[in-house]
A protein has these predicted regions:
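Generic non-transmembrane alpha-helical segments
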Residues: 27-32, 109, 218, 222-231
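Hydrophobic, well-ordered secondary-structure segments
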Residues: 127-141, 151-163, 190, 197-199, ...
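N-terminal hydrophobic or amphipathic helices and topogenic motifs
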Residues: 1-66, 70-71, 91, 231-271
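Bilobed "Venus flytrap"/periplasmic-binding protein-like clamshell domains
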Residues: 5-28, 88-158, 233-242, 250-252
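Acidic, polar ligand-binding/catalytic clefts
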Residues: 49-109
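A ligand-binding cleft/hinge motif common to bilobed small-molecule-binding domains
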Residues: 60-72, 134-135, 163-164, 168-188
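Short helix-initiation/N-cap motifs at beta->coil->alpha
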Residues: 36-50, 81-82, 140-160
Length: 271
């Protein structure tokens, strides 16, 4: 019998927030009548290892990873960020951040400086950034930045790299940015948002492709009904979410469109 696991490490910006996510998913699982085991150190494994685990029960995963078929998983439900730009939908975007004392007033002002991105499997840290930059390229200006630091791996590393002056601009998941600004404001006090990308489907909780249909259905129903439960309000306030929504069947198609557009333009990597 499979011991199904859960994890929300993508958005565990502080120990308090991770505890909140754990509490929420445990309550959802209880409401669903499903037994899930929380694995706190899941993201110490490589993405490839996580994606190919057959015991994923409710684990947060980037939609771009799903879209490019790197992970054979079933999308269960995605959080609805408590943000004006989300407008009550399970969507997110990337904030392009710089230091508050940087001279830049527009994105174009950063061209020629040093940028960074996280990983080629990331929507918020790579694909969205690349798509946003695509509109600024011209035949005469194929590369926008003087230097690009690749594979910084995480939003936290982008944030720290901007704070410490290792890069001048970089993309961070806007929902992650909201959370860390609320719960660790000292880390973003010297940072400002210069621009933001278009919104796309929010990273969902997923189950392994071989997970029982009944289990997935129960979890999906419990996630989407969570906001109506008496226990939800305090956790929603902590995690800055309004509830959960089931992703549409084509929720991540737009991510692939952005990927194709960039590659057809010869823009394989943000530059």
């Amino acid at each position: 019998m499979t011991d199904w696991i859960m994890n929300a490490g993508m958005y565990a910006v502080t120990p308090e927030v991770e505890a909140g996510w754990r509490d929420l998913v445990e309550r959802v699982a209880r409401d669903a009548g499903v037994t899930l085991t929380y694995v706190p150190d899941l993201w110490t494994q490589s993405l490839d290892e996580i994606c190919h685990r057959s015991d994923l029960g409710a684990v947060h995963l980037c939609g771009y990873t799903i879209a490019v078929k790197h992970a054979a998983v079933i999308a269960i439900a995605a959080p609805i960020p408590r943000a004006i730009w989300a407008a009550g939908h399970a969507v997110y975007r990337s904030d392009l951040i710089v230091r508050k004392d940087a001279p830049y007033r527009t994105l174009e002002d950063t061209f020629g400086a040093r940028a960074g991105w996280t990983a080629t499997h990331s929507q918020s840290g790579f694909n969205a950034f690349r798509h946003h930059l695509l509109a600024f390229r011209t035949p005469q200006r194929q590369a926008l930045y003087g230097e690009v630091i690749a594979n910084l791996r995480s939003a936290r590393n982008i944030l720290d790299s901007v704070r410490e002056g290792h890069i001048d601009i970089g993309p961070v998941d806007a929902y992650w940015h909201m959370l860390i600004t609320r719960h660790a404001p000292q880390l973003t006090a010297d940072i400002r948002i210069l621009a933001s990308t278009e919104v796309t489907a929010m990273p969902p909780f997923v189950a392994a492709a071989g997970a029982p249909t009944e289990m997935v259905t129960r979890l999906r129903s419990a996630f989407t009904a969570a906001a109506t439960q008496p226990w939800f309000k305090s956790l929603g306030d902590l995690l800055l979410i309004e509830g959960f929504a089931q992703p549409a069947a084509d929720a991540f198609a737009r991510l692939l469109e952005w990927d194709r557009e960039a590659k057809m333009a010869g823009f394989e990597l943000p530059a």
